[in-house]
Every structure is written in C-alpha cells, then in structure tokens.
Amino acid sequence: MKTVLKNCRVLGTTHDKDMLHDIYVENGIIEKIGLNLEVEGAKQIDVGGHTVMSGLIDMHCNICDPGHEYIEDIATASRAALRGGFTTITCEPNTDPVIDNKTVVEYIVSKSKEKSLVNIYPYGSMSIGCKGQEIAEIGEMYDAGIVGISDGDEFTDSAAFLRNVMIYTKMFDLPVLTHCEDRSLSGV
C-alpha cells in the first residue's frame, strides 16, 4: 500500500523543522521525505502540521515478566510502550527470577520475539540475585542477548565490587547502569 502523509513537521532529522514536509510510505516503510511529493496511486493523508518523529527509546523499564505477569507481561508492556510512541524498550533485571543467567535472558528474548509489538532488549544483572555480592555470569548472558548490565533499582554498596564488574564487562563492550548512590552517605 502506498501512502503520502502531507504537511508533516518532521522532527529529529536533517529536515528543517519549521517547514512542512511530505512522507512517502510504501508497505509500512518510509521511502522518501520531501516537499510536495506526488506518488501515483498513493493514498494521501493531510496531517495538518502535526509532528512526526522517530520512535522513542525507554532505557529503564520494569517489566514484571517473568514472575509477576499478573501485573504486567511482555505483551502488555509492549502495547503500553507503543501507545506512548516508544518503539524500543529495555527490561531491567529485577524480575522474579532475576535476569542473572542465560536461561532467563533466553526466555525474555524468545518471548519478546513472539509477543512484543516493540523491540525489547534485556539488561543482565551485574550480581547474582541483584544482591551486589557475587558477579553474575555476564559472558553467558551477553551471548544470550543482553545489551547492558544493571542491578535494577538496587544500590551497589561496594565500590570494589562495581569496579570488578566494570573490568569484566569491558570485555563485552557493555554499558554498566547503576544507581549512583552510596547508602553509607545517603542514610538509606
């Protein structure tokens, strides 16, 4: 199906945001952005100057799957994300069981491919059980599909532990995401 979206304010590209552009879409794929596009046989929709932009990315989602799917699962999280304009989300590791091994990563990746309307990328836990004591098997989780390391909403109490995680994680060129808070200073 061919569609031309007319009079779009295109945000996040090299196009002048103060000019209205047309977007030619064929079979769900943007083929061209330009001025006064005419495509034979295309349905034309005037969007009246509304903003069109790339999908958003949420890098801190607490999806309750696995473990508490009655609250939210991968399918419902993806529907909520898509409704809000997000085309990619990450999955924090503080699920039940924690994403601290390749089996749980494989579950998230597989279920996301099967049920999700958006891209879902899991973070692996930096520690077993998100407890900040023993380093999780980051290499195996990396091979299974994690895109970063985090202990979710848990604090890292030991700078030495975090340093060791960073050294290990550097081998895989993965980002380490952590709450920058020291309980001994914050009184938590």
Name each region found by the language model.
Residues L37-V52:
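Active-site metal-binding motif and surrounding structural segment of the metallo-beta-lactamase
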Residues L5, K43-I45, I57, T90, ...:
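Hydrophobic/aromatic beta-strand patches that form the interior of the parallel beta-sheet core
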Residues L11, E92, G152:
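Conserved residues at the C-terminal ends of beta-strands
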Residues G48-S112:
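Metal-associated gating/positioning segment near the N- to mid-region
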Residues M1-V39:
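N-terminal metal-binding scaffold of metallo-dependent hydrolase/deaminase domains
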